[in-house]
């Protein structure tokens, strides 16, 4: 009854799998030069379909699978991302040959490919737990679980503001700076900050030391703030951004 009041409904596994497979097929058709029918056969049945993939194109196919980005804006209990985790895992196992670590492939997919948001904290906790359990079942020796704080987050994906800051206005910054002849400098700074954030997030994902995690959270917060400030040419937006501590809001 509570789920109905919130507009939350259970999606049958068959529907989840169908949607995940069709999404993956559409992505691979767009990002590889492999024939559509061969892509479809491969995704629907990797062990049989891989036979029709030319050897010379398999590295490109594997790279596309490793680079895909998936975001569920209303993740709920994580059914759709878990479905895509299984589809990606199956495809990558077949392309990896005989020597591969199933748990490590799962960790790689969760770290590099999957993101999710939900307005309900309980849903976020359940989704994170499902991903952790999916790793544990394939590990012979238990290892520290990855930190999913920046992978699956609580928030409202229907609005474009955070802590009173209208983030939609930041998208106009590039055009604004282009008009002022500052685009090259802006792009260089943006790329540098993006690389810094990516490096920090990668370190945080596998960090198990509490003090180090707290320090990394603050460094991530500072780097993201700098990136947002670089885009905020409006003085009022800039002032609001400086008041936000992302590390505190992520706890």
Give residue spans per PLM region.
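Conserved AdoMet
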Residues: 1-2
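SAM-dependent methyltransferase catalytic region
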Residues: 5-251
């Amino acid at each position: 009854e509570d789920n109905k009041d919130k507009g939350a409904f259970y999606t049958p596994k068959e529907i989840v799998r169908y949607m995940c497979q069709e999404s993956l097929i559409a992505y691979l058709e767009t990002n590889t030069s492999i024939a559509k029918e061969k892509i479809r056969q491969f995704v629907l049945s990797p062990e049989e379909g891989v036979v029709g993939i030319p050897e010379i194109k398999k590295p490109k196919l594997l790279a596309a699978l490793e680079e895909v980005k998936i975001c569920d804006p209303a993740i709920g209990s994580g059914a759709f991302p878990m479905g895509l985790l299984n589809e990606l895992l199956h495809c990558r196992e077949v392309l990896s040959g005989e020597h591969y670590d199933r748990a490590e492939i799962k960790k790689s997919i969760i770290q590099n490919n999957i993101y999710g948001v939900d307005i309900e904290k309980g849903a976020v906790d359940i989704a994170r737990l499902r991903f952790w359990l999916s790793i544990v079942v394939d590990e012979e020796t238990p290892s520290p679980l990855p930190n999913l704080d920046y992978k699956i987050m609580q928030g409202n994906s229907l609005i474009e503001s955070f802590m009173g800051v209208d983030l939609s206005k930041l998208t106009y910054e590039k055009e604004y700076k282009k008009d002022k002849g500052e685009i090259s400098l802006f792009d260089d700074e943006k790329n540098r900050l993006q690389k810094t954030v990516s490096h920090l997030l990668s370190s945080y994902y596998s960090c198990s030391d509490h003090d180090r995690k707290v320090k990394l959270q603050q460094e991530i917060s500072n780097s993201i703030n700098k990136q947002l400030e670089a885009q905020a040419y409006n003085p009022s937006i800039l002032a609001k951004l400086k008041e936000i501590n992302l590390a505190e809001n992520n706890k």
